[in-house]
Every structure is written in structure tokens, then in C-alpha cells.
């Protein structure tokens, strides 16, 4: 009995003495694995963005009082990015970038680029910029889509791999943006009538129940693809979720989820 008692005390003593050491070892292992995971995550991201043969389309959204959207293209080498914009498809701008962990895994365009800093850099007219970002938290990435969040405006940006040259793609975007001229459309969703108004200059649409007050309409930024309008975030109404509208110029209409909205 006494022997068992002393053995138990000894075991407890050894446990108490070794506990801090074990905890320290566990912390060390945890820290190491966290660092490894971060490194693997960033290495995977860097490999993805530099491995795209034609680069990426970047659906860029700015926020605040000057909110708008533009399609950029970005092509990455190990430390440089080459960018172009739908506003001038043949013009390119090259600068440095980095992929790093700051407060979170991030993609940072840390040297001036006249394309990528168009809405982020201050100027004489816009001393705080125009609601854009050049530092982004990496929200998620896969082979067919990357999502980023701006550090200042908190707007979501989307990158899609290009299947053709940047200039060819941007010329299609520019042509479509210039041809789209709808100002207001309406359609039936379930048993309800829905109206959509377009702010073509700033690239917003206002959507909601037909006859609703302006304050009841939801304001959603959109961006042009080659033949559609892609919403920055989906709109839900009467059990149907809308995220992208195809355009029919001849019919003066847009369609999503099998529902057509016509100009009126």
C-alpha cells in the first residue's frame, strides 16, 4: 500500500515537472506547423499566379464615394506583374509585387503601377485616391478562380485565368461595355415583378420590386465580361438567385436563370 502510494506520488511529481516541457514542445511543434502551412499556402498561390500561360483577368471593384469597376489583366513572373486595363488594352504597365504574410496571407502591389494604382493612388483631384486598393488579403484560390479582399475598401476582387492574350480579351470587354446601352428593364420572378435600373457611368444596377421606392432597391456593383454583366454579389428574390446576366442587343434584354428582363 505504502509502496503504491509513493509510486503514485512519484508519478505525479514527474508529470508536474515534465508538464511545462511537454507544453513547450507542443507549442514549438504547433508554431512550426503553422509556419509550414503558411509557407505552403503562399507557395501554392505564387505557383498558381505565375503558372497561368496567358495571365489573369482581374475584376476590380473600388468602393466609397467613387465606387466603380474595371477589368484589368495581370501576368506574373517571380517578382514582377504586367498589367493592362479595358480602358487602353494595348497599354501595359510593369511593376514589382510580393506575396507575404502580414496580418494575413496577402498579395501586395508595392511599387507604383499606373494601371493597378489607378483607383488607389492619391492625386491632385483625389487626395485619398478613388476607393481602390493595392494591398489585398488572399481570401481563397483555386485553378479557376482567385478571390481577394482589399485592405482599405474591403471590396472583393476576382481573378479568372485567361484563355487568350490580354489585349484580345480586353478589346472584347471594351467593345461590349461600349455596346451595352440598357437603362431600365423589368421581368417577372415567380409571382412578383422585378425592375432593374442601370447606372452605366459608375457601373451599378439598382434592383428590386417593381413600384418600390428608390430606397427599397438594392444597389449592386457589376462588371462587364465578354458578353454578360457579372454582379459583385448575388441578388435573391422570390426563391431565385441572380449573379450574372447575359445580354441580347437585338431584343434589348438581359437574361439570368431562365428569366428575361426587357427594356421598357
Model region roles, listed by residue range:
Residues 10-16:
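Hydrophobic helical h-region of N-terminal Sec-dependent signal peptides
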Residues 152-156, 162-264:
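Preference for solvent-exposed, low-hydrophobicity sequence contexts
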Residues 71-75, 95-98, 133-139, 220, ...:
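Hydrophobic/aromatic beta-strand elements that line small-molecule binding cavities or substrate pockets
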Residues 55-67, 84-90, 119-131, 185-189, ...:
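Short, solvent-exposed secondary-structure boundary motifs
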Residues 80-201, 205:
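Long, acidic/polar, low-complexity amphipathic helices and coiled-coil-like
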Residues 1-9:
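Bacterial N-terminal signal peptides that target proteins for export
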Residues 17-21:
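C-terminal motif of bacterial Sec signal peptides marking the signal peptidase cleavage site
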Residues 23-106, 170-180:
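Acidic/polar, low-complexity intrinsically disordered N-terminal segments immediately downstream
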Amino acid at each position: 500500500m505504502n509502496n503504491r502510494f509513493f509510486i503514485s506520488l512519484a508519478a505525479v511529481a514527474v508529470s508536474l515537472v515534465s508538464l511545462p516541457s511537454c507544453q513547450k514542445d507542443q507549442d514549438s511543434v504547433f508554431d512550426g506547423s503553422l509556419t509550414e502551412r503558411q509557407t505552403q499556402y503562399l507557395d501554392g498561390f505564387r505557383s498558381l499566379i505565375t503558372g497561368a500561360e496567358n495571365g489573369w483577368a482581374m475584376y476590380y471593384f473600388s468602393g466609397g464615394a467613387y465606387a466603380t469597376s474595371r477589368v484589368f489583366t495581370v501576368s506574373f513572373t517571380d517578382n514582377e506583374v504586367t498589367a493592362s486595363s479595358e480602358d487602353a488594352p494595348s497599354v501595359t504597365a510593369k511593376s514589382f509585387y510580393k506575396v507575404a504574410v502580414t496580418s494575413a496571407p496577402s498579395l501586395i502591389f508595392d511599387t507604383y503601377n499606373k494601371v493597378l494604382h489607378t483607383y488607389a493612388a492619391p492625386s491632385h483631384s483625389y487626395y485619398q485616391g478613388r476607393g481602390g486598393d493595392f494591398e489585398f488579403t488572399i481570401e481563397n484560390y483555386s485553378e479557376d478562380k482567385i478571390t481577394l479582399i482589399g485592405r482599405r475598401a474591403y471590396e472583393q476582387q476576382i481573378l479568372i485565368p485567361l484563355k487568350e492574350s490580354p489585349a484580345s480579351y480586353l478589346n472584347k470587354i471594351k467593345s461590349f461595355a461600349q455596346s451595352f446601352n440598357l437603362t431600365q428593364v423589368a421581368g417577372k420572378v415567380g409571382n412578383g415583378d422585378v425592375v432593374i435600373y442601370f447606372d452605366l457611368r459608375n457601373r451599378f444596377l439598382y434592383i428590386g420590386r417593381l413600384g418600390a421606392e428608390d430606397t427599397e432597391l438594392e444597389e449592386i456593383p457589376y462588371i462587364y465580361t465578354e458578353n454578360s454583366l457579372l454582379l459583385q454579389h448575388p441578388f435573391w428574390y422570390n426563391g431565385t438567385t441572380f449573379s450574372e446576366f447575359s445580354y441580347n442587343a437585338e431584343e434589348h434584354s438581359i437574361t439570368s436563370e431562365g428569366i428575361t428582363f426587357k427594356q421598357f
